[in-house]
Amino acid sequence: MQERHTEQDYRALLIADTPIIDVRAPIEFEQGAMPAAINLPLMNNDERAAVGTCYKQQGSDAALALGHKLVAGEIRQQRMDAWRAACLQNPQGILCCARGGQRSHIVQRWLHEAGIDYPLVDGGYKALRQTAIQATIELSQKPIVLIGGCTGSGKTLLVQQQPNGVDLEGLARHRGSAFGRTLQPQLSQASFENLLAAEMLKTDARQELRLWVLEDESRMIGSNHLPECLRERMTQAAIAVVEDPFEIRLERLNEEYFLRMHHDFTHAYGDEQGWQEYCEYLHHGLSAIKRRLGLQRYNELAAQLDTALTTQLTTGSTDGHLAWLVPLLEEYYDPMYRYQLEKKAEKVVFRGEWAEVAEWVKAQ
């Protein structure tokens, strides 16, 4: 039964999206997990806590005995059934616990007794996590080109279309602004970093990578922050700025934030609740920048948002949203981005409309 030990083995697991049966407790999994992992714990949170307390008070033998007592009979059988099904569904997968210690070895042994030989990660999640951190540090050293531009410039799409592009907002499940949240909850910080590392490793493995194409992001993307090694390199990177006509930007924003988000909410929650969630999403985004807008301006825009939502509900038209979106761009988002760009003006190496920037990036 081959078990993996080397740094290259760990990297290969991440590049291949090897299915990982992670037998740690749910609380550990939520704090940080690998992208291709599924959580089928040997012990639940309460059982793990009880065994941990026993270990501190009575030692390892007593803790092991308690663990076997807690995971016995019908409970053990239910978990065995889940592991067996996962192994059969993922024959190329691998077992993982915190450090490649007792938990993954116990599950491996029980599976062997049931006629299934399944490998485990020697070193466990900790080894994979260290590999992810080291890979990000190493790969961040390659040159970077940032795609900049005001809100609605299509920066994310441009990055997505590059073979050497990494969509940081997609990985973070957030579009980086007050209106940036998606219907998917954001990952824990460690899980986000692991996902980013795996994406960088896979992108690098597919080609002779000369440089990265990334969106010009701030340190925070929603609740996730960029790894410091990557953030530091991004502050030194060249910037290509998309400068599209205002009307084209409005069309993109209408599609992304009104038409698509309304569709996504109603698809997820049904027409009635989906509409309420969509309205709440837009109001929450506007409310998040209330202090910067000032109370009077916020109240004016919030009233225009309500009017636009009423129009959208009754007619299906999203045109009414321009009444609050246009001033929001002209008074808040555009001046803020231009101010930020001025501070790094010496880094700007190209400016043009979307297609021109896309062509320039391909030539690099």
Curated annotation (Swiss-Prot):
InterPro entries attached to this UniProt entry: Rhodanese-like_dom, Rhodanese-like_dom_sf, SelU
Catalyzed reactions per annotation: 5-methylaminomethyl-2-thiouridine(34) in tRNA + selenophosphate + (2E)-geranyl diphosphate + H2O + H(+) = 5-methylaminomethyl-2-selenouridine(34) in tRNA + (2E)-thiogeraniol + phosphate + diphosphate; 5-methylaminomethyl-2-thiouridine(34) in tRNA + (2E)-geranyl diphosphate = 5-methylaminomethyl-S-(2E)-geranyl-thiouridine(34) in tRNA + diphosphate; 5-methylaminomethyl-S-(2E)-geranyl-thiouridine(34) in tRNA + selenophosphate + H(+) = 5-methylaminomethyl-2-(Se-phospho)selenouridine(34) in tRNA + (2E)-thiogeraniol; 5-methylaminomethyl-2-(Se-phospho)selenouridine(34) in tRNA + H2O = 5-methylaminomethyl-2-selenouridine(34) in tRNA + phosphate
Described function: Involved in the post-transcriptional modification of the uridine at the wobble position (U34) of tRNA(Lys), tRNA(Glu) and tRNA(Gln). Catalyzes the conversion of 2-thiouridine (S2U-RNA) to 2-selenouridine (Se2U-RNA). Acts in a two-step process involving geranylation of 2-thiouridine (S2U) to S-geranyl-2-thiouridine (geS2U) and subsequent selenation of the latter derivative to 2-selenouridine (Se2U) in the tRNA chain.
Catalytic residues as annotated in Swiss-Prot or TrEMBL: C97
Gene name linked to the record: selU
EC number(s) on file: 2.9.1.3
Name under which the protein is recorded: tRNA 2-selenouridine synthase
Record key words, sorted: Selenium, Transferase
Gene Ontology biological process: tRNA wobble uridine modification
A Pfam family recorded for this sequence: Rhodanese
UniProt keyword Kinase present: no
Keyword match Transferase: yes
Subunit-level organization: Monomer.
Residue ranges constituting the Rhodanese domain according to the UniProt record: 14-137
Gene Ontology molecular-function annotations: transferase activity, transferring alkyl or aryl (other than methyl) groups; tRNA 2-selenouridine synthase activity
Family affiliation: Belongs to the SelU family.
PROSITE patterns: RHODANESE_3
Top EC group: transferase
Cystine residue pairs: none
Matching HAMAP family: tRNA_sel_U_synth
